[in-house]
Regions:
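Structured-RNA-binding interfaces characteristic of tRNA pseudouridine synthases
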Residues: 1-124
Length: 124
């Protein structure tokens, strides 16, 4: 439930099907050209990234999205989460999500809000 004290730290979103979200997040795992999952203005030499983990899980009253990769592009996670949520809302098809992940065509260019997004660990 909404709390003004948490508003800066979480994005309030209605409950969704975590099983389906994980199925969709599984499409991101592996080596991918994520050119349609980055904002312009980054200084990356390449948009190729390897995603090791992309999953969603429940923790207390929260739904957590967890990504682990060999690097991230500017806006990548916010675009990825927004795209998954659009499929869950029925505003984008699973096929369109797959095509965007396969760098064939961009269907979603909207970002999920930054509230609650944080980098938890850097591994070398």
């Amino acid at each position: 439930s909404y709390s003004p004290f948490m508003a800066s730290y979480v994005h309030f979103y209605p409950k969704f099907d975590l099983g389906k979200a994980n199925e969709l997040l599984g499409f991101f795992v592996g080596k991918k050209d994520l050119k349609f999952f980055c904002k312009s203005g980054g200084d990356n030499k390449t948009t190729l990234r390897e995603i090791f983990i992309a999953r969603a899980y429940a923790y207390k009253d929260f739904s957590i999205f967890h990504f682990k990769a060999n690097g991230f592009l500017r806006g990548q996670i916010r675009l990825s989460v927004a795209s998954v949520l659009k499929v869950l809302e029925g505003k984008m098809s699973e096929k369109e999500l797959k095509e965007q992940i396969e760098a064939k065509k961009q269907y979603n260019h909207f970002l999920a809000p930054p509230n609650g997004l944080y980098l938890s660990r850097i591994c070398y």
